[in-house]
């Protein structure tokens, strides 16, 4: 599994939208190239903190970025809005969806901190990270999670952030440009495979890169 981290308003969700769009197209969006096998083309996107209205906006933007019509179901993208549930209920719903949705290749968890009550609890953090590793192994899928950075430093927030850094294959850092807040920079904070060149993006009037 992998993760994106960044401060509030750094456009982490937008960056992940590009990853999902690349997976839906099975080609390249921004600098992300995806190649999912034919029997694992489905993407499951889980949002734990936004309203259904905001989730719909994110879904439409992903479809537009993938060059797909945004007014009908693509068949390859499944969205779960879990804001109203408790952390245990969220884990249970996500587990059910991962094990009972056929053809899934990529799972996004936008808001992994909402799968625990206390981000500084070693027990809870170890449990959810172990779940991520179990799900990826059992279902042979890739999971990408999103987590905020601490306000005061570059670290991912809480004990769950420490666990993510220790266990993730890749941790992407999304940062606002210091001189122009319309621009965000993406770099690999930690990567076990081949490194990639940092890049930047800005969003146009149609909310596209």
Which role fits each region the language model picked out?
Residues 12, 54-55, 117, 153-156:
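Secondary-structure boundary/capping motif
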Residues 10, 50, 84-85, 150-152:
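Short histidine/acidic/glycine/proline-rich micro-motifs that form metal-
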Residues 3-4, 9, 123-208:
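Phosphate-binding/switch region of NTP-binding enzymes
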Residues 30-36, 67, 95-98, 134, ...:
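Short, flexible, glycine/charge-rich loop motifs used to bind or transfer phosphoryl groups or to couple energy/partner
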Residues 37-123, 127:
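Conserved inter-motif catalytic segment of the P-loop NTP-binding fold
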Residues 1-68, 171:
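Walker A/P-loop NTP-binding active-site region of P-loop NTPases
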Residues 20, 45, 110, 168, ...:
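Conserved RecA-like P-loop NTPase ATPase core
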């Amino acid at each position: 599994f992998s993760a994106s981290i960044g401060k509030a308003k750094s456009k982490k969700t937008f960056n992940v939208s590009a990853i999902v769009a690349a997976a839906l197209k099975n080609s390249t969006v921004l600098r992300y190239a995806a190649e999912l096998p034919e029997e694992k083309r489905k993407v499951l996107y889980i949002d734990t903190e936004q309203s259904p209205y905001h989730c719909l906006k994110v879904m439409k933007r992903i479809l537009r970025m993938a060059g797909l019509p945004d007014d009908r179901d693509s068949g390859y993208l499944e969205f779960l809005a879990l804001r109203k549930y408790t952390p245990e209920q969220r884990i249970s719903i996500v587990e059910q969806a991962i094990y009972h949705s056929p053809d899934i290749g990529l799972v996004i968890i936008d808001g992994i901190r909402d799968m625990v009550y206390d981000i500084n609890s070693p027990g809870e953090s170890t449990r959810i990270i172990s779940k991520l590793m179990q799900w990826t192994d059992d279902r042979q899928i890739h999971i990408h999670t999103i987590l905020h950075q601490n306000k005061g430093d570059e670290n991912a927030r809480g004990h769950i952030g420490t666990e993510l850094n220790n266990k993730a294959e890749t941790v992407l850092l999304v940062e606002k440009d210091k001189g122009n807040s319309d621009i965000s920079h993406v770099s690999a904070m930690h990567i076990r495979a081949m490194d990639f060149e940092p890049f930047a993006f800005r969003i146009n009037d149609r909310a596209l890169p």
